[in-house]
Amino acid sequence: MIYSSAENKKVKEYKKLKQKKYRDKTKMFLVEGQHLVEEAYKNGQLQELLLEEETNYNLDIKTIYLTKPIMKSISSLTTPPKIMGLCKKNVVKI
C-alpha cells in the first residue's frame, strides 16, 4: 500500500515526530538514510521501514510506501532520503 495523502493518520503521526515533545510522549523517532536504518535494525529499535514508492529495499519488518511529497513532508533534511525508519527509543534506567 502507498500512502499519498497528507491527511492520512499514519502520515500525520510521522510529521508530529519532528516535535521533541511528541517523540518523548510516544518514545518513537525517525531515522533517515540507509545507514541509520540498518543500524537501528541491527539494534532492534526499528519498528517500521518507510520507503519512497518504487524503492526496493528488503528487511524482515513492516514496510510502508510513501509518495515523494509525503517523504519530503516528514523529513527534516533538505533533500529527503528514499529510506527512513520509525524507531522505538530504548529507555536506560540507572
Describe the residue ranges of each PLM region.
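Acidic/glycine-rich phosphate/pyrophosphate-binding loops and surrounding catalytic core
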Residues: 78, 83-94
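N-terminal positively charged helical leader segments and presequences
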Residues: 1-80
